[in-house]
Amino acid sequence: MLRWLTAGESHGPALVAILEGLPAGVSVTSDDIAAALLRRRAGYGRGARMKFEKDEVSIIGGIRHGRTLGGPVAIQVGNTEWPKWQKVMSPDPVPAEELEGVARNAPLTRPRPGHADLVGMQKYGYDEARPILERASARETAARVALGEVARQFLRQALGVEIVSHVVAMGSVSVPDDAPIPAPEDLARVDADPVRCFDPETSARMVAEVDDTRKTGDTLGGVVEVIAYGLPPGLGSHVHWDRRLDARLAGALMGIQAIKGVEFGDGFRTAARRGSAAHDEIDVGPDGIRRRSNRAGGVEGGMSTGDPLRVRAAMKPIATVPRALDTIDVSTGQPAQAHHQRSDVTAVPAAGVVAEAMVALVLADAALEKFGGDSVAETVRNLRGYLDSLIVR
């Protein structure tokens, strides 16, 4: 079983991430993790913060000479902007005179609609939003992307699983229903696209949508799809709600900031169909039993089917709107304009990379639940034994 935790604030010295339960022998380096973090920063519509804040990766435990040791993996993602925030975000007390007149230390008393600001202040007893927004920020996803890269390498090396994502909708622009989906070898092409869309014509329309939205001082949401190739049948279980693979994946994806909906395969479209047109019929092909389609998205009864896993996540428009939404100044009780931090027009392309990481972590957990192993070699052996012993093929 895998367990993972992250710690740190948006403008703190670093984010720290710990992954426990990974077998020994997974090949992974700082460069692998740095490359994953660079993918998270890309995408048309990102804000100025992506240009000057850098992710400094340090592996501080669990890996030696490029291979996991079997103990907890600890990764630090440093914040190059920390010197500017050192006094404001200091863990230790700072004399009041040193903070006097520091603009960054001004109380944030105008909570932003759509953020954790207001309810977080109420829940934790703060009279300003800084202590809430620092942890609620999507900056925290950098730590999850770092851990997700380690999980991705395990899945690739132990199971032969490959994960790819792409943007399928941005604002009012969507890829056609019959558009091809990217294969693992297409990931570089997807990443090279400004909005990480696999369809060039749709990509151009998405870029125009971002430009129009920027001109009006607004923000844009969208939908990303994650596809996992090479999964064996039987990850997850039907026996309890919390062991169902789709439930675990949905929870992980809903835990990403600004994600408001998740669907598998044809998802909500199946609700409008008759049952005879909603399911995947079964027959026998040259390689054994197979499904004629993949409307279920690679999951049936809470278990992977062996077909490609297809899951989509809907991201709401970023809540920090440049033209500022109406709110209340909690220090005066009077109407006010919401505090505006630097923000993106859209972060949908980056959301796909974060979604990949969460899918990788859940799938790695499910794989270890099924096959176990204190080393990658042991996991591979157990997987082969399982596949060789399948009664129904």
Swiss-Prot record:
Residue sites binding NADP(+) per the record:
R40, R46
Biological processes per GO annotation: amino acid biosynthetic process; aromatic amino acid family biosynthetic process; chorismate biosynthetic process
Residues that bind FMN: R135, A136, S137, Q257, A258, G301, K316, P317, I318, A319, T320, R342
Q: Which GO terms describe its molecular function?
A: chorismate synthase activity; FMN binding
Please list where the region (Disordered) is annotated. 280-306
Tell me a GO cellular component. cytosol
Query: How the protein assembles, per its UniProt entry?
Result: Homotetramer.
- State the family named in the UniProt similarity comment for this chain: Belongs to the chorismate synthase family.
| Name used for this protein in its record | Chorismate synthase
Please tell me the species this chain comes from.
Thermobifida fusca (strain YX)
Gene name in the database record: aroC
